């Protein structure tokens, strides 16, 4: 995966430079419209199970972001379905994935890759058993097959009566399946395709289905 590592370093550096005006504008908007810290920082499980700090633009109220950031192994990976916790600006940032732009710094540092499993909190990563733990051989990614398939995860969870149960029994196992497929059928060409589909909001054929 030498090509993947090289691409991550070069593309993340270029991305940070090219997108710096947008990063500054978003940071200023958050500072003006959402009093409090600009960034949301949280410990996530990285490659080989090593914890690292992920950086995102803050999209929730200060009280809830602080609660999320301080959660330990009992935290969940479930996207919040309580829209009252997300600010109007935060909702727009999430809709266009602008809240994830600071993760380019994580990619440049080597904590993450452009494509891979989403970095999970310890509570859910600890549920991986047996061969499932092979997923931890990968660097977590900004996007990936599971991210593409569940790009509307918040909407899905808000439509079911028991979001936690649905996530535990349906979404989480399916994400594990897709991430294992990604590990065992790695393709740099597919990486590029997934990045393009993420940016353009398009679907693609992967692992015998449309994601």
What are these regions (language model features)?
Residues 1-64, 182-211:
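A hydrophobic, helix-centered structural microdomain
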Residues 94-103:
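Short acidic-aromatic low-complexity motifs
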Residues 9, 85, 174-176:
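N-terminal alpha-helical segment
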Residues 1-2, 77, 81-85, 100, ...:
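Juxtamembrane loop-helix boundary motifs flanking transmembrane segments in multi-pass membrane proteins
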């Amino acid at each position: 995966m030498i090509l993947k590592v090289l691409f991550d370093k070069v593309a993340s550096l270029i991305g940070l430079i090219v997108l710096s005006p947008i990063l500054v504008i978003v940071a200023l908007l958050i500072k003006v419209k959402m009093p409090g810290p600009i960034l949301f920082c949280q410990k996530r499980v990285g490659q080989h199970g090593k914890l690292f700090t992920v950086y995102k633009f803050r999209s929730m109220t200060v009280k809830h972001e602080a609660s999320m950031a301080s959660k330990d192994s009992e935290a969940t990976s479930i996207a919040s379905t309580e829209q009252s916790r997300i600010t109007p600006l935060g909702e727009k940032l999430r809709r266009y994935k602008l809240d994830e732009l600071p993760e380019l710094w994580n990619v440049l540092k080597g904590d993450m890759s452009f494509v891979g499993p989403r970095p999970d909190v310890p509570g859910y990563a600890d549920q991986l058993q047996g061969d499932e733990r092979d997923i931890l051989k990968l660097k977590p990614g900004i996007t990936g097959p599971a991210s593409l398939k569940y790009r509307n995860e918040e909407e899905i969870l808000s439509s079911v009566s028991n979001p936690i149960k649905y996530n535990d029994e349906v979404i989480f196992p399916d994400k594990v399946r897709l991430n294992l497929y990604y590990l065992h059928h790695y393709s740099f060409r597919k990486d590029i395709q997934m990045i393009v589909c993420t940016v353009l909001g398009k679907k693609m054929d992967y692992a015998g289905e449309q994601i």
